[in-house]
């Protein structure tokens, strides 16, 4: 399982990368491997407001459809349109090519509520 140390993680298997006053969000390597081959990704529009712990989109795999949960509240300022034509990026490159949205957080301190890489790995091990 690939778990980059510089990221923060939600219990719902999303990752967060802080980039100045914004955050980039995607799903973890563990999540994509559990889902199997991703065939469709549904993401919010730029300008949408997302709320921490609430659904903001979904990923569809050959096995199932799974909701994406916002790890932080804020306004969507960028969406990875590449995933419309290339949903397989989620399986191939969950932390780079397959980022999903960029958000301008309402309260950056919400990041402190997220898990470190070590905490996330421990949570996954415990099941």
Curated annotation (Swiss-Prot):
Name of the protein in question: Glycine cleavage system H protein
Protein's UniProt keywords contain Isomerase: no
HAMAP family on file: GcvH
Note describing how the cofactor binds: Binds 1 lipoyl cofactor covalently.
Stated role: The glycine cleavage system catalyzes the degradation of glycine. The H protein shuttles the methylamine group of glycine from the P protein to the T protein. Is also involved in protein lipoylation via its role as an octanoyl/lipoyl carrier protein intermediate.
GO cellular component annotations of the record: cytosol; glycine cleavage complex
Gene giving rise to this polypeptide: gcvH
Oligomer and partners: The glycine cleavage system is composed of four proteins: P, T, L and H.
PANTHER family associated with the record: GLYCINE CLEAVAGE SYSTEM H PROTEIN (PTHR11715), GLYCINE CLEAVAGE SYSTEM H PROTEIN-RELATED (PTHR11715:SF3)
Matches recorded under NCBIfam families: gcvH (TIGR00527), PRK01202.1 (NF002270)
Family, similarity comment: Belongs to the GcvH family.
CDD domains the record matches: GCS_H
